Amino acid sequence: MKLLIVSGGYTDFDFAIDLIKKSGFEIIIAADSGLNFFKAADITPDVVVGDFDSVNQEVLSYYRDNEFIDFHVLNPEKDDTDTEYAIRFAIEKGADSITILGGTGTRLDHVMGNITLLGIGIEYDVSIEMIDAFNRIRVFNKSLL
């Protein structure tokens, strides 16, 4: 099953829209402020996860009223990031391929932290890639080649 996670980092709008239209994702997840992208794109995600400390509150209210979205409200005092929770949720749902948008951007510390999250895929034998308009980052072992 192919899943998409959109996190809160910079996302090239046109690139992301094109990817979503062409890739046939079976489940689309917004991780916290990644929800802002969906509102701008007029797309409804299937799942929303986060402590919602960085999402626009009007956007959050707009989607919270949608009974077809599976909401997961996280405790702000947690060890995992919203993106990590989204990855683990995707794996629990049976994902064998996860694509992350918004995992790169202007904060190098966030980019490096998100790159380390790709290793979760090795642990569960799930292909995880983080992409943007210029880069594709993957971590894999022999079983994921």
Locations of the language-model features?
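Glycine/charged-rich beta-loop-alpha catalytic/anionic-binding loops adjacent to active sites
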Residues: D65-L74, I98
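Short, acidic/small-residue loops that bind anionic groups at enzyme active sites
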Residues: I120-I137
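Long, charged alpha-helical interface segments
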Residues: N135, F140-L145
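N-terminal glycine-rich phosphate/adenylate-binding segment common to multiple enzyme folds
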Residues: D96-G105
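Short phosphate-binding loop-to-helix
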Residues: D70-E92
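Short Gly/Thr/Asp-enriched flexible loops that form oxyanion-binding sites at enzyme active sites
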Residues: L108-G119
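N-terminal beta-strand-loop-alpha-helix module at the start
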Residues: M1-Y62
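Gly/Ser/Thr-rich loops at beta-strand to alpha-helix junctions
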Residues: T11, T104-D109
